[in-house]
């Protein structure tokens, strides 16, 4: 969408005349903030050029193999706690990413890119995921699945926003939709457990064909501090300093139970690697899944939460 373009159901001047005046209503900036415009460019010509570039990354249909592009290796190395865009940049080909919906659901990064010259979709998570962030990820994965574009999900998050307000705004519905979207998608899916992948957010985002646990990540059904408060309650209560005892137990629990190696041992991940070898592992995983074709049962569709 061009910066000077307008998009609305109700003309801003009509709405304002009725007392419903909203700043920037109908503008490209408002469309981007609402998650309607995927990209905003300065001019119509630049917007058309960007649209052509994105279409060029996509195959003609879900059965056509992707185009192969020239590429350069990235120079960055994946680090736990990195901003989503930087985490993605460490995995995809250098300068190949085209971010979509940057102004909407900002704790999730979604982009088309290439890995080893092959088109992929990338979802990378930030600290906390609100209902808009989750909706953004769901929609992007559905788009990738429609064209059988492989999806790489980089998971490093505190989880869904712990907020009753966000729940009422649609947090629970969107989380259910996210889990259903990943489960329903038949395209190749690779999950990189780069940092924290705890509780329901792991269940939703790590529904992949191959899950790569990066050394130093935390994979757990429950936040370690909460887990030890239950498992070692009597021992912690008997200590002189409950906070210090809880922290010590949580650190030990994280190292012994929530490690990358233990995630592989218990089936929560398929392989482990260090940060320097994440891209190589992703390239190998995509090569392994390049011939994936999933057969569907002859039925209409599932009952996804919409």
What are these regions (language model features)?
Residues 1-306:
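Ligand-binding clefts of soluble mixed alpha/beta catalytic domains
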